[in-house]
Amino acid sequence: MPRRIPWIIKYRPKKIADVVNQDSAKKQFIQWLESWLKGKPSKKAALLYGPAGCGKTSLVEAAANEYGLEIVEMNASDFRRRQDIERIAKTAAFMRSLFARGKIILLDEVDGISGTADRGAIDAILHLLEITRYPVVMTANNPWDQKLKPLRDASLMIAFKRLSERDVIIVLKRICQLEKLECEDAALREIARRSEGDLRSAINDLQAIAEGFGRVTLNWVRELSAYRTREYAPFEALQKMFNARYIFQAKSAISQANIDYETMMIWINEHIPTYYDDPEEIWRAYEALSRADVYMGRIRKSGSWDLLSYVFDMMGPGVAFARKIYRYKWKAFRSPKRLQLLAQTKRSREVREGIAMTLAPRLLTSRATIKRDVIPFLKIIFTHAPKYAAKIALGYGLTEEMIKWLAGPKSSEVLAYYRRLKR
């Protein structure tokens, strides 16, 4: 019996024009790839991001096919450790293709890299970008995790939008024609609706029903096609929440966001005044958000996670239905400035915390007391009395990084005395 080929492989786009929609992304990607082929790339890597099943990997494969390039593919979910990436990707970055063709190095699903378990993987990718002779393409569903910031900075960011139901239906109809399959239009519409723009899952559902029953009807789709629990990037979650027509839509948008609840609260807090224009609507939205914050505080104190449902009610429907009348409004949501500031000051806060942890047991007090009462005086000593500061640092076991943080502009002077005392 011949082996059946999955339709997502059988009908994978062979040409760039076959990739559904995504005209802006295709144009950006081709311009970047051609700049590489001419030897003058603006960025050594491109990071393609967008929802699952919207054509990111398909575009790379179609472009490689059209330009006669070999793809060296790694999936970050499978190869996570630094040595994995170095061994495979760096070999690909230098070795010529067997048929003397160019290459594209594809790192799929880089958002699958964990910040702790996969320590060193990001650094290995950054090093690869420095030495590679070939274009490097990365894909991600959600590239906005803070751990991926170095990759965002080093790459050309190319956004892919979620496919519409119409886009999905067009592809499904074409497959039905090529497979000489009897498909009800209503059934294809239902598959497309349930896919929520994920073309890959829609094709899989179509094949499963077709192979099981020989034809695709609305009844079979309703019986067998699954509603999938999808995660939304914060931008999508906010768009769905603010434009929700029904309470359940606003609530599910928040509960399915791919960031934690407290971070989502920061996103909502920043965008309420940019989305609503009416002062009363803004007040009502903040009133709902403040109640969500109260419930989160009670959860933290008591561990009563049954209150989480009320958090979702206030964050989602409470904020969304602060409006007086329904009106659809498209808004470009940006990463909150508070999160950007926290990211910029993260290392400084870590050093401050390290000083508190070092001094607290020696001074027989709490870390909070060290940060509040001791560190401000240490900063004065380290900037005005370098010799004495060096003795304190040596006596209490402070590291050179801690000295630099405390001494600021006088750090070189304090470090010189410190190193002399250590000899």
From Swiss-Prot:
ATP binds at residues 50-57. InterPro entries: AAA+_ATPase (IPR003593), ATPase_AAA_core (IPR003959), P-loop_NTPase (IPR027417), Rep_factor-C_lsu (IPR023935), RFC_lid (IPR047854). Pfam families: AAA, RCF1-5-like_lid. One of its GO terms (biological process) is DNA replication. SUPFAM superfamilies: P-loop containing nucleoside triphosphate hydrolases. One of its GO terms (molecular function) is ATP hydrolysis activity. Part of the RFC clamp loader complex which loads the PCNA sliding clamp onto DNA. Heteromultimer composed of small subunits (RfcS) and large subunits (RfcL). Belongs to the activator 1 small subunits family. RfcL subfamily. This is Replication factor C large subunit. It comes from Staphylothermus marinus (strain ATCC 43588 / DSM 3639 / JCM 9404 / F1). The lineage of its organism: Archaea, Thermoproteota, Thermoprotei, Desulfurococcales, Desulfurococcaceae. The gene is rfcL.
